[in-house]
């Protein structure tokens, strides 16, 4: 299996916080890391899975490159968006992004049976934006204040608003097993 990690970090130093922990989870697989600013020249078809990593609260530069992510719609294989990656996946399918700051540990309740997680669990959130409602996605899990996990209704695409690399690494592993 070959995995593509897309860094949404403008600054390379931020990747130590948002990409490297995911690398630790997938380190036994074949993987590449690419920055979001280099997506347009990438051959996506060589990858079996794509993970769009998160970034820091002050780093919103990836929002200027949302159009480039639309190529992922036709990837045909698994996509997982984490934090800013969640927002990117929602934007790809014209879902409305809202201002919704969440920082710290939150309680997450699974809404429907899904391959990523089950039951109730705690997760670490650190984001400025989220979605209030979705039409192209199934809501897999919610917190008291917002949607936390989604799956696209027609393609193999998932999003998590929180950072599973912090306390819920099994979500990333489960995604790779789909």
Positions of PLM-derived features:
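Amide-donor transfer/coupling interface in amidating biosynthetic enzymes
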Residues: 2-15, 21, 25, 40-45, ...
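Flexible gly/pro-rich beta->alpha loop and the following alpha-helix that scaffold active-site loops
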Residues: 23-81, 93
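Active-site loop->helix "elbow" adjoining a glycine-rich segment at hydrolase catalytic centers
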Residues: 82-86
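Short gly/pro/ser/thr-enriched loop/turn and capping motifs at secondary-structure boundaries
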Residues: 87-88, 106
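Conserved active-site segments centered on acidic
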Residues: 91, 95-98
């Amino acid at each position: 299996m070959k995995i593509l990690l897309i860094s949404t970090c403008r600054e390379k130093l931020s990747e130590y916080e948002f990409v490297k922990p995911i690398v630790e989870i997938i380190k036994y697989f074949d993987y590449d890391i690419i920055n979001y600013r280099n997506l347009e020249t990438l051959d996506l078809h060589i990858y079996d899975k794509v993970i769009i990593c998160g970034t820091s609260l002050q780093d919103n530069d990836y929002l200027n490159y949302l159009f480039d992510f639309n190529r992922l719609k036709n990837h045909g294989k698994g996509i997982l968006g984490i934090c800013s990656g969640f927002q990117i996946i929602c934007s790809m399918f014209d879902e409305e992004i809202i201002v919704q700051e969440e920082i710290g540990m939150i309680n997450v309740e699974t809404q429907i049976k899904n391959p990523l997680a089950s039951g109730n669990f705690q997760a670490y959130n650190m984001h400025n934006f989220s979605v209030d409602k979705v039409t192209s996605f199934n809501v897999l899990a919610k917190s008291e204040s917002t949607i936390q996990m989604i799956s696209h209704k027609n393609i193999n695409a998932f999003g998590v608003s929180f950072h599973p690399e912090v306390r819920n690494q099994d979500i990333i592993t489960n995604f790779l097993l789909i």
